[in-house]
A protein has these predicted regions:
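P-loop NTP-binding core
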Residues: 1-169
Length: 169
């Protein structure tokens, strides 16, 4: 099972586009894919044809704030073999809401591991679309993943950003 976070603190580098296209491509070769939209902008959600206006508890936000289980919020997409856990703007408040939780960086890892252990054969890949920052959400994705994919533009500032990301990791 590969859990891949597509990460870069810079916006507009193709993280969401990479997640959507990689997920769609892998699903076409009969791999079972779960996309987790961890970006409050919810572009992976809308890019895969779902609404990012859902009730917050029916999204990854509900999982991370403890009101829902992963199995409750997985949604089918129009693509066979491709499911998603959607996101919306309410996710941006999670950092403040969990400020007193010393284990908050591990919430996603714990919940995802429990779900995948119960459903090991359901998915071949989990792809996590990260927000354009080195925030709590990005740290949650980092500790939950066993692989990272870092899209870069071919410019100096992108390389500077990669250096910052490597230091964070």
């Amino acid at each position: 099972m590969q859990i891949i976070s597509v990460i870069n603190q810079k916006g507009g580098v193709g993280k969401t586009t990479t997640v959507i296209n990689l997920a769609a491509g892998l699903s076409q070769i009969d791999k079972k894919i779960l996309v987790i939209d961890l970006d409050p902008q919810g572009n992976a959600t809308t890019g895969l044809g779902l609404s990012n206006m859902d009730n917050s508890s029916d999204t990854i936000y509900g999982v991370l704030n403890g009101t829902r289980e992963i199995s409750d919020v997985i949604k089918k997409t129009q693509f066979e073999n491709l499911d998603i856990i959607t996101s919306n703007v309410d996710l941006s408040g999670l950092e403040v809401e969990t400020a007193d939780d010393s284990n908050r960086a591990f919430i996603l890892k714990t919940k995802l591991a429990a779900y995948l252990n119960d459903s090991r054969s359901l998915y071949d890949y989990v792809l996590i679309d990260c927000p354009p920052s080195l925030s709590l959400l990005t740290v949650m994705a980092l500790v939950s993943s066993n692989s990272l994919l870092v899209p870069l533009q071919t410019e100096f500032f992108a390389l500077e950003g990669l250096t910052q990301l490597i230091k964070t990791i």
